[in-house]
Curated annotation (Swiss-Prot):
Species whose genome carries this gene: Pyrobaculum arsenaticum (strain DSM 13514 / JCM 11321 / PZ6)
Protein name: Isopentenyl-diphosphate delta-isomerase
Catalytic activity field: isopentenyl diphosphate = dimethylallyl diphosphate
Amino acids binding FMN: 63-65, 93, 122, 192, 221, 271-273, 292-293
Coiled coil: none
Compartments where found: Cytoplasm
Length: 352
């Protein structure tokens, strides 16, 4: 199956409920209500920084797509909204545009429609692992130029690759390749998961190279489930995808794991379905959060701006009801954890 067909499959499946698996455990994070907040709602200021760049909210558009005509239209709409709201935006994996230059435009529309916001390039770890240093540097330079990227993300998607019919489960030497990416990019490096989470052991290894870790935890879009749904004629892929679709670290737990060993910038993603979930992620210690599936679905339904406005409003309400004026103050809000998250933290020897 061609990579362009695969990209469109991912769009339709990711926007459907079939791709949504497990729980991110945000329902296990209760922010204590402040009946006497001693602030006005108008006092709340969501502005913050994203790896040093000023942005209007601690919220961004997560990695989604690129490489097909449909993907290009989606990216253009996402970019326009990101520019309007002053929030960062990831693009989807740029590999397709690096091997098929005729589809570069599906990514270039992002810099054309969002000239001033931080844009994040996106490359896959298994592909980088197979490139020579010269080829890798060339890919990084092209990916950055394609969208005028402020930062570069490398996604870790071992679970997806090992169940994907066309997968490339090649991860030997990735850590060394990340160092090359950082040197070649000359800008912040984000290392991210795509729905299975990052443990404290992996975060400790990434500390030497990553300027930011995006936890990409379990509880939202599952690329394992997506690949299983795509594998209509491949019984083995369907079988193993069904077996492993709940594999991973829930996002709330992953934030805590990463924060316990990593002092860099932490981005929460995976199963964040509202501004309240985003506020919970910030309370756990994340500096920023992103959403993908709800925004993809909203784009396809013609209500993207309404969805972004709702998320931003929900974050502000959560801040008002906990009595904080700035996003970073959410980390000081008293909270109670449910039994599943508490048990995870205890067994892993992690506090949050």
């Amino acid at each position: 199956m061609g990579i362009d067909k695969r990209k469109n499959d991912h769009i339709y499946l990711a926007s459907s409920d079939l791709s949504q698996v497990g729980t991110a455990l945000f329902e296990e994070v209760v922010l204590i209500h402040n009946a006497l907040p001693e602030i006005d709602f108008s006092d709340i200021d969501l502005s913050t920084n994203f790896l040093g760049a000023p942005v209007k909210a601690p919220f961004g558009i997560g990695a989604m797509t690129g490489g097909t005509e449909l993907a290009g239209k989606i990216n253009a709409e996402l970019a326009k909204a990101a520019e309007e709201f002053g929030i960062p935006m990831y693009v989807g994996s740029q590999r397709i545009a690096l091997v098929k230059p005729e589809v570069r435009w599906t990514f270039e529309v992002v810099k054309q429609n969002a000239p001033s916001i931080p844009k994040i390039a996106n490359l896959g770890a298994p592909q980088l692992a197979q490139l020579s240093e010269k080829q890798l540097v060339d890919w990084v330079v092209q990916a950055v130029d394609m969208i005028d990227a402020y930062a570069v993300a490398v996604h870790l998607n071992a679970a997806q690759e090992v169940v994907q019919p066309e997968g490339e489960p090649s991860f030997r030497g990735v850590l060394e390749k990340l160092k090359i990416v950082k040197r070649a990019a000359g800008r912040p490096l984000i290392v991210k998961e795509v729905g299975n989470g990052i443990s404290k052991e992996v975060a400790a290894k990434l500390a030497e190279v990553a300027d930011a870790i995006d936890v990409g935890g379990l509880g939202g879009t599952s690329f394992v489930a997506i690949e299983g749904a795509r594998a209509a004629d491949a019984w083995l892929q369907r079988r193993v995808a069904e077996t492993f679709k709940y594999w991973g670290i829930p996002t709330a737990a992953s934030i805590c794991e990463v924060k316990s060993v990593y002092r860099g910038f932490v981005i929460a993603s995976g199963g964040i379905r509202s501004g309240l979930d985003g506020a919970r992620a910030l309370a756990l210690g994340a500096h920023f959060f992103t959403m993908s599936q709800p925004l993809l679905k909203a784009t396809l339904e013609g209500r993207l701006r309404e969805e972004i406005e709702a998320v931003i409003t929900e974050v502000k309400i959560a801040m008002f009801l906990t009595g904080v004026r700035r996003p970073q103050e959410l980390a000081q809000v008293p909270r109670v954890y449910g039994p599943r998250l508490r048990a995870w933290l205890e067994q892993r020897g992690t506090t949050c």
